Amino acid sequence: MVKQIVRDVFFLGQPSEPATKADIQVGKDLQDTLQANRERCVGMAANMIGVKKNIIIVNMGFIDVVMFNPVIVSKRDMYETEEGCLSLDGVRKTTRYQEIEVEYYDFNGKKQRQKLSGWTAQICQHEIDHLSGKIISPKRIANIRFDRTKKTNIGG
């Protein structure tokens, strides 16, 4: 079911709780909500749809991957960038890693481990930050538009 996007910074600033098997529907709601916002974002965290659970969805090009209880287990090649967020206005400066390795559980409860790099790694890091309540005050910049080629606006 498509859910409304939460823009309450106080709510988004609170850490999420571990997901359980009972939270499968939240993953499906994230799929539906990301699909409905496809033109504006490439990833989401459950708190963005009002659920404080450790669940994210990340667009990996041709597929959207839902991750339950994702944890970054390794990272390398730090860089600075600016990102947008569907829950916040404007863009913000942040630090990311070019390459990460993330562990998570899939819809079947099977543990997965995946190496990500570039844009996909950036999206994943952004969404995992949401789970811990990390919010950086946005810097307003006029006429910011989502552009997958410039890779500046995460959206979620």
Task: Briefly describe each language-model feature range.
Residues M1-G156:
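Positively charged
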